[in-house]
């Protein structure tokens, strides 16, 4: 089963949308196997967004992601990266499909509710960056028989 990293950003946490976002993810058949509400340390933010260092928006991005708690999570399911990317929607909420998390709940590119890994490689890197092994669990769910052939 594939795993991916998702992070509900400070704007969604402050708007009390954690439950709404998780519910949408679970309704699509993905299973939450790790999660934590946390204040992001500066060093973690800089490492996570290191690829954007030197870009004009980098400092604002780091300030935003460390400004309030986030809900970091690991979800599991068949084709989890692609399924979660589809549920999340386009980076720019005004271009995101209705029914997607960003299309329905996002306000601007900078306040777009959620981060999701964009590849299996990114998912593995981000999961290892944000979680220790003992913070992720595996479990069987009766619904699995109804979700997967």
Swiss-Prot record:
Gene Ontology CC: cytoplasm
Cofactor (UniProt): Mg(2+)
Record key words, sorted: ATP-binding, Cytoplasm, Kinase, Magnesium, Metal-binding, Nucleotide metabolism, Nucleotide-binding, Phosphoprotein, Transferase
Superkingdom, natural source: Bacteria
Protein's cellular compartments: Cytoplasm
Pfam families the UniProt entry points to: NDK
Gene3D superfamilies the UniProt entry points to: Nucleoside diphosphate kinase-like domain
GO biological process: CTP biosynthetic process; GTP biosynthetic process; UTP biosynthetic process
GO MF terms held by the record: ATP binding; metal ion binding; nucleoside diphosphate kinase activity
EC number(s) reported in the record: 2.7.4.6
Family annotation (CDD domains): NDPk_I
Record-annotated active site: 115 (pros-phosphohistidine intermediate)
Reactions the enzyme catalyzes: a 2'-deoxyribonucleoside 5'-diphosphate + ATP = a 2'-deoxyribonucleoside 5'-triphosphate + ADP; a ribonucleoside 5'-diphosphate + ATP = a ribonucleoside 5'-triphosphate + ADP
Binding-site positions, ATP: 9, 57, 85, 91, 102, 112
PROSITE patterns in alphabetical order: NDPK (PS00469), NDPK_LIKE (PS51374)
Keyword Membrane: no
Role noted for this protein: Major role in the synthesis of nucleoside triphosphates other than ATP. The ATP gamma phosphate is transferred to the NDP beta phosphate via a ping-pong mechanism, using a phosphorylated active-site intermediate.
Family note: Belongs to the NDK family.
Subunit comment: Homotetramer.
Protein's name in the database: Nucleoside diphosphate kinase
Organism: Staphylococcus aureus (strain COL)
């Amino acid at each position: 089963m594939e795993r991916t990293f998702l992070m509900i950003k400070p704007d969604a946490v402050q708007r009390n949308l954690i439950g709404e976002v998780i519910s949408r993810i679970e309704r699509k058949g993905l299973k939450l196997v790790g999660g934590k509400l946390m204040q992001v340390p500066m060093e973690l933010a800089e490492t996570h967004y290191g690829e954007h260092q030197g870009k004009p928006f980098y400092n604002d991005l780091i300030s935003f992601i460390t400004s309030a708690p986030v809900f970091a999570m690991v979800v599991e399911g068949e084709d989890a990266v692609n399924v979660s990317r589809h549920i999340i929607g386009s980076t720019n909420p005004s271009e995101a499909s209705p029914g997607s998390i960003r299309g329905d709940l996002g306000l601007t590119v900078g306040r777009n509710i959620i981060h999701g890994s964009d590849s299996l490689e990114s998912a593995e890197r981000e999961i290892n960056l944000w979680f220790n092994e003992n913070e992720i669990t595996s479990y069987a769910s009766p619904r699995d028989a109804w979700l997967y052939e």
